[in-house]
Structure formats: structure tokens, C-alpha cells
Amino acid sequence: MPVSPKQARTLKHQLWVAFLVVPPIVFMSLFVVYPILSAFAYAFYDWQGLARGEFVGLKNFKEVLFGATMAPVVWNAFLHNVYALIALMIIQNGGGFFLAWLLYKEPFGFRFHRVAVFVPVVLSTIIVGFLWKLFLNPNFGIINQALYSVGLDALAKPWLGDSSTALGALILANAWHFVGFPALVYLAGMQRIPLEIIEAARLDGTNEWQLLRNIVWPLVAPSTTILFTLLFIGAFNWFEIPYVMVGLDGSPFGSTDVLGLVFYRTAFGNQSASIQNFGMGSALATLLFLFIVVFASMLTLWLRRREIQF
């Protein structure tokens, strides 16, 4: 049966679409969907990585949540993830908002500053981790040297070796690394605000703080929704910065332990615990995945209800 030119064009278009769509679907299925489903399955087995052991049902989940050995480590790490989330919401996203406002007002050289703010974001997280590890070195790090130079010797300390400052140091390094991203997202949101609204508020005698709090902040709510959701996901997937700066053990004395490190140690072992337990590691990963999906969805819905359309 002869094919009309229109049918031929339609067929060609469909083949081209299939050519573009099928490879990514296959790639995602092999390297994303299959590993996730496999992790769900492994969580129900006593599996050490070589040969699948016996089916243990919910035993791995119970051990992760309530076990005498595993649960205290998991809950300690979970609290550190929560602390990181709260601190990064204030420092990283809050700092990004104020940086965006400064850039929005287009100060002298603002194009250079806009690029400079974003440069740390494109750096490798491994490089950033090593860089801040050098900055915080107690002997020759730039932080302590700066304190010595201004006579504040009493404030100098081993930042990564002190339980009271180690987690804060990691949070600071992470905020420096990524603050440029929320800054540019908020800047894009601010540039969408009609100038008439800003000018009318200024004519009414609104000061800078009132303008930010009552006008700008509510109108960039869509940007806030995106950034808080991404930060929530990132905070509970936190791994690279702690791993590079303090190692797998969450030193000192577990004060920097986070769920990503606990998962890695459990599934793959480390220097002090070489036993691998993929089953329990998969159970932890499954619980973390479900927690992130559920609460990130709830957070997104709650924030979207607070958005203002203009």
C-alpha cells in the first residue's frame, strides 16, 4: 500500500522521536531504576555482597531503626543531617537571598560579582573539600593564621578536630560552595517582579527591611519553593564534603557523622570496620529514599500554597 507524503513525514517524525527518547530511557532504566529496585530487594536479605544470603524479612529495617548497635549511630547521624538542613537554610539560602538583593540593585561591577558568586558552585566538591580542609588546618590554615595576625590567638583551634566546631566547619564549607546557586535563582525571581511594585513601595515610605520582608520575599516564593526542596534533598544526601574533610568515621567521636557516611560504612565497610553488609545498607538507603520522597513532597506542597501570583 503506497504511503502518502504526509504519512511518510509523520513516520519519519515518530522514528526521530524514538531515536531521541529510547536511549535515555534505556540508560535511566539500567543505571537508575534497576539499582533502586535492586536496593529495595536486597534490603530484605542478609547479603554480604558476594552471594545473596537468606531472606530475613524486616530484620534489617528493625536493626537500622531500633537495633542496639545500629540505631544509635543512625539517629545520631540523622540529627546531624537535620542540623545541617536548618543551618544551610539560614546561611546558604538566606545568604543567597541577600546576595541576590545586592546584585539586583546593580552595584558597580555587578556583572563581575555575579560571575564571582557563582564560580564556587561549578568547582568540584572534592576540590572544595580539600581546599577548606587546608583553610581549617590548625597549623598553617588561613583561618587560624588570620586570627593570629589580629591578636585573637585564643580563638584559634583545630576546627575539624574539635567536636564543638567540626560540624559547623563542614556546614560553612558547604554554604560557601553552593551559596551562588540560590543567589542566582533568587536574582532571577527578583528580576521578574514588576518595577512598579518596588517603586510604589518606596514612594509609600517603605524602608529597605520592610521592602525585603513584606514585598520581595513573598513575591520570590516560587524560587524559595525550588531552593528549599533541593536543599532538603541535598541535606539528607550529604556525603562528599564530610567524606573529604573528616573521613568515613564522622570524626571526631561521631560529631560529624551523617546518614551518607553511615550508609557507606555499612554497605562497603571502612578502615575500622571492614565487614560489608549490603542488606542492612540497602535497608538504610530505602528508608532514607522514602523519607526524602515523602517529606520533600509535603514541603513542596506546603510552600506552593504560600506562593503569591502576580
Each model region followed by its residue ranges:
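Short, Lys/Arg-rich, polar N-terminal cytosolic tail immediately upstream
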Residues: 1-11
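A structural signal for multi-pass alpha-helical bundles of membrane permease subunits
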Residues: 10-310
